[in-house]
Structure formats: structure tokens, C-alpha cells
Design a protein with these regions (language model features):
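Sec-dependent signal peptide cleavage junction
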Residues: 18-30
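Aromatic, loop-rich ligand-recognition surfaces of beta-strand-rich domains
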Residues: 26, 55-108, 117-158, 331
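Glycan-recognition patch characteristic of GH18 chitinases/ENGases
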Residues: 156-265
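Substrate-binding surface in catalytic domains of secreted glycosidases
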Residues: 165-166, 198-216, 284-396
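Conserved, mostly hydrophobic/aromatic
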Residues: 188, 280, 332, 371, ...
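An active-site-proximal structural segment forming one wall of the substrate-binding cleft
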Residues: 255-278, 297-300, 304, 315-325
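Active-site groove signature of glycoside hydrolases
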Residues: 263-291, 335-338, 443
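Glycan-binding loop/region signatures in secreted carbohydrate-active enzymes
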Residues: 368-433, 453, 459-472
Length: 472
């Protein structure tokens, strides 16, 4: 959660190592099958036509890395749809496109482009009506095989209730902050500046970790409250954790000696600033003892907060929440980024949905989950660099996730590898999946990384436009 602050660079290295390990896990096949089994597949009786004109009854598209191969899918009649789901055996495809037409052999219109498919990729194309789909694999890292296609027209009355929840770094708030996206948000989690000490007291620090007066924090919160006045947006505070020394200070603040003081201070802080809830970003409990202390703390803070929102930033691995504790967590902000593929891509679609599946297997209900998306880039060589999406203005388009950008990483090393972002289309796909999978919402790290909302490539705009189009 702390990609933009130098203060926490050491922690990020730990997160990265853990994420690299996580990325070796299954790639989303199970949850994609479970999710879309609930909807009518409009391609279930389709015919697949090879480039030579031969027709086959089952969908298949295979080839070699150096080939640009395609098949045509005949739905049998002109069909209204908004979603195409493709599945691959393996992890080889790195670029594919979808075209559509109502004529078998001509007048094909470009619909869609993305990169990785793996266990399944939701391709959200908006409201369209066509008979023929032409699927191209443009690039792959080896022999590839696509084995399944689903075509759906999914609308939901529940789409309007999808949470759009963004972290906002308090230090970024000023009179010049861009708040043009506020109408697209339902929740804001205010991260940092306020920080715990080893006894659970709350102190205030600047971006370099130097202690400052609370008035700095209060003034920034006042700016945000003025901007959100009259809007139905929950404001939730996240008080930074005292990382370092194997979490010694965290263990101290959650210990039997200090936990009641920690809870008391959180409750007083939430009440003082009239926040709608409290979020905790604990990355990560490293022992059974830490998990025991964490579970005990969560019971206490839930009781103290009453009807206020209890939110947690959670990574989808090594979940050791007690069963009763899972039930009292209102929102799990699932961190689904900095998880790299063999190609060096972070936060690709299939790895993201696989993380959601792990949360469900870990005992969470789908409505508790906010699917985390990054509004920042990572270099494909995995160096320590996190670049804001908006810094690539002028290099962006709707579909491309790889950006060529020369700079120095946060350790001063020159960068030549491409930057991997989540494009407008990728964010749209993940939003559509969140609706289709009946998730609680979308979570963004972090708010000031985006372009202004009136920019056609704004990622907040991608979320909101998809959310609106998915409504019945």
C-alpha cells in the first residue's frame, strides 16, 4: 500500500518478494469458470471457422510464438453482448485482439485488445451487436492454445451498488489537489501522516518520517471535507503502522499491555475527525503470535467502533484470520498488484482474479471484497520503481499496458525496461468482473495517480463508465 513513500521502501522490497512467490500460483481458471457458469453463454452453440474455411464445433485457436493466427466464431445470428471471456491452456499469449462483423468475410470492426489470457480473461467490450467474432493472437512467448470462448450480455441491478474506494495519501492533499473524480467515488481511505508508535499512541509525521504538529493533518482533512461536502462519500482513516525490526513495535502496540490503549486512541481519533470508519494496513503478520494478537485486536476494535466501518488491506496469501474475525470485517481491500508474471507484467487480469479466488477460499464473502487495482506502473525488470499513471500522459491509449519510459528507479539505477500499467481497458475489464462476480467493490491505490476525470483515458472514468453500462 505504500508505493509512493520513500519512508517505506524497505517494506516494499518484502512485499515484492512475497508477491513474486504468489505469482507462481494457479491463474484464475477456477474462479472464471465458477463466475461465468452463472450466466447464459451466447456462444455455446457457436461454430468456429478456421482461416482456410474449415468449420469445427468447438472453439480452438493454437499456434506458435512467431505466428499471427486467428479464428472466426459464428454465433449463428446477430447477437447483443457486452462481454467475451477467453481461456488458455498455459501462459503464453502476450497480445490478442477481437474484431466483429455481421458479414462473414468482410467489414470487421476492431472491438478489443489486451495481453495475457491464462486461466481466463474478461474482455469487456460495451454494448454491441454482431454475429461474427474474429479472435487474433498477435504475440506469444511460445506455443499457445486457446480452448474456450464465452460470449455474454451481463447487466445487473446490483452494479449501481459497486463500491469505488480509493486510498488517498494525506500528504498529497492541498488546495491544488485534483478532486475532479469525486462523483465517481463512494469511499476514500485517508492514508498516512497519522502513525502509531510502539504503545499505540498516534503521532504525526511528514513524508520523511519527521514528527510534525497535528494541525498539519487537521488542515489537510479540512480541505478534503470541504471538497466532499454534500457528496455521499465515506471517509475512512488509515493510521500508518510502525514497521521495522521484525514488526517489534507492531507487536508491542497489539500486546496485552498496550492493545487497550491502541483501541482507545483509534476510537477517539475516529470520533474527533468524525470519520466513517477505520482501515488497517498491516503488511504482514509474520508469525502465529502476530496473527493471534491481530485477531484479538480486531475483536476489540470492532466492538469499540460500533456501527463504523472496519476495513483491512489484505494480501491474498497466508490468511490466518479466525472464523469469527472474518465475519466482523466489513471490507477487505485486496491488494492485487506488484505480483509479476514470467514476462515481468504486474497485476495482469488472471493473477488478479486468482487472488480474489484465494480470498473466497479463505472464508471471505464476495461482498466483503474490494478488488484492488493499481493506478501506477512497475518496470518489467522488477526494479524498485512505482510510476504514477498520469506521468505517462501523451504516451497512453485505451488498450496498451506497456509504456516505454526512460528514467531512474528509486535507488538511482537507470531504467530501460518497459513500464507495465493497467490501461483504461484493463481497469474496465476488472470492474466488469467485479460486477459479474458479485464483489463488494473496486479499491484503488492511489487517488492522485490518475489523470483528471475529464480526460478520456482517466482510470476513475473507466471504472465509473463501466459501472454505469453494467447496470440493468
Amino acid at each position: 500500500m505504500k508505493k509512493a513513500t520513500k519512508l517505506l521502501s524497505v517494506l516494499l522490497c518484502v512485499v515484492l518478494i512475497t508477491s513474486l512467490f504468489s505469482a507462481c500460483s494457479p491463474n484464475g481458471k477456477a474462479i472464471m469458470s465458477d463466475t461465468y457458469a452463472n450466466y447464459d453463454n451466447l456462444a455455446k452453440t457457436s461454430v468456429t471457422i478456421k482461416p482456410d474455411g474449415k468449420e469445427i464445433s468447438s472453439f480452438k485457436l493454437s499456434g506458435k510464438a512467431e505466428e499471427n493466427n486467428y479464428v472466426t466464431v459464428d454465433l449463428g445470428k446477430k447477437t447483443d453482448f457486452n462481454t467475451v471471456v477467453l481461456k488458455e491452456n498455459g501462459k503464453k499469449v502476450t497480445l490478442f485482439e477481437i474484431y466483429a462483423s455481421n458479414d462473414k468475410d468482410e467489414n470487421y470492426t476492431f472491438l478489443y485488445q489486451s495481453d495475457c489470457i491464462e486461466g481466463g480473461h474478461t474482455c469487456y467490450v460495451g454494448d454491441v451487436s454482431y454475429r461474427y467474432l474474429r479472435i487474433f493472437v498477435n504475440e506469444a512467448s511460445g506455443k499457445f492454445k486457446l480452448y474456450d470462448i464465452g460470449v455474454y450480455n451481463i447487466k445487473s441491478e446490483k452494479a449501481k451498488n459497486l463500491r469505488v474506494n480509493s486510498y488517498l495519501i494525506v500528504n498529497d492533499i492541498s488546495e491544488k489537489t485534483d478532486f475532479s473524480m469525486l462523483d465517481a467515488l463512494t469511499d476514500i481511505i485517508l492514508f498516512g501522516t497519522a502513525k502509531f508508535d510502539a504503545k499505540g499512541n498516534i503521532i504525526f509525521v511528514d513524508g520523511d518520517g519527521n514528527q510534525i504538529d497535528e494541525k498539519v493533518y487537521a488542515d489537510k482533512i479540512a480541505i478534503l471535507k470541504n471538497a466532499t461536502k454534500g457528496k455521499e462519500i465515506n471517509l475512512i482513516c488509515d493510521i500508518a503502522m510502525p514497521y521495522g525490526n521484525d514488526n517489534a513495535d507492531i507487536i508491542s502496540m497489539l500486546s496485552e499491555e498496550n492493545v487497550d490503549n491502541t483501541v482507545k486512541n483509534i476510537k477517539a481519533f475516529v470520533d474527533k475527525y468524525d470519520f466513517d470508519g477505520f482501515d488497517m494496513d498491516y503488511e504482514f503478520p509474520n508469525s502465529k503470535n502476530e496473527w493471534k494478537l491481530f485477531n484479538a485486536f480486531l475483536r476489540k476494535i470492532d466492538n469499540a467502533l460500533g456501527d463504523k466501518i472496519l476495513s483491512l488491506a489484505v494480501a491474498p496469501w497466508d490468511l490466518q484470520f479466525d472464523e469469527d474475525v472474518i465475519k466482523i470485517i466489513d471490507r477487505a481491500e485486496v491488494m492485487l498488484y506488484d505480483m509479476f508474471t514470467a514476462h515481468g507484467y504486474h497485476s495482469i487480469f488472471p493473477v488478479t482474479v486468482n487472488g480474489i479466488n484465494k480470498m473466497l477460499q479463505g472464508g471471505f464473502d464476495s461482498k466483503q471484497l474490494d478488488l484492488g487495482v493499481p493506478f501506477y506502473s512497475r518496470p518489467t525488470n522488477k526494479l524498485a520503481y512505482w510510476g504514477n499513471y498520469n506521468q505517462y500522459d501523451g504516451k497512453l491509449d485505451k488498450y496498451t499496458n506497456l509504456i516505454y519510459f526512460n528514467d531512474f528507479d528509486h535507488d538511482g539505477n537507470p531504467m530501460t525496461a518497459p513500464q507495465y500499467i493497467n490501461s483504461y481497458q484493463m481497469i474496465s475489464d476488472k470492474t466488469a468482473f467485479a460486477v459479474d462476480a458479485n464483489l463488494g467493490g473496486i479499491m484503488i491505490w492511489h487517488m492522485t495517480c490518475d489523470l483528471p476525470y475529464d480526460n478520456e483515458l482517466s482510470l476513475f472514468r473507466a471504472i465509473n463508465e463501466t459501472k454505469n453500462l453494467k447496470q440493468k
